[in-house]
Amino acid sequence: MFGKLIANKRVLIAAVVISILAIYFIPLGSHGLLEPDEGRYSEIPREMIESGNFITPMLNHVKYFEKPVLLYWMNAASFMTFGQNEFAARFATALCAVLGAAAAGALGTFIFGGTAGLISAVVTALSLLYFAIGTINITDMPLGFFLTVGMSAFYVGHIGGNKK
């Protein structure tokens, strides 16, 4: 029976995707925000929503330009979608983690084929440190995601049709 399940590649891929989504998103709201970083990166978008100023990040009503504003915008969108809670505060980084694993899988598929791509996505998503960073609200995972996508796009563009 298990052999037939694996034989149907679409079912296997769907099961892997659903499992990884569950592993990342279900526990996001299970504990309070970790200080100081999660509190800081959650307060800034809360103040953006409160003031209506999405250009200048403010922390306790003082300009805060120490980090790029994209994470604050993603968190503000998450707060407006899911409400102001722990799940919403961590949603953007978890989404970046899952999409980063998918990008690693896509690059693996491009270079080595479908099986290697699936394995690379699963190994990336289930790596302990990657998972830990991907489920807390800090800037590391969005940075890693955009670097992965950018470098993968460069590689695919550079190799292009010359892939052997």
Predicted regions and their residues:
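Membrane-integral, polyisoprenol-dependent glycosyltransferases
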Residues: 2-164
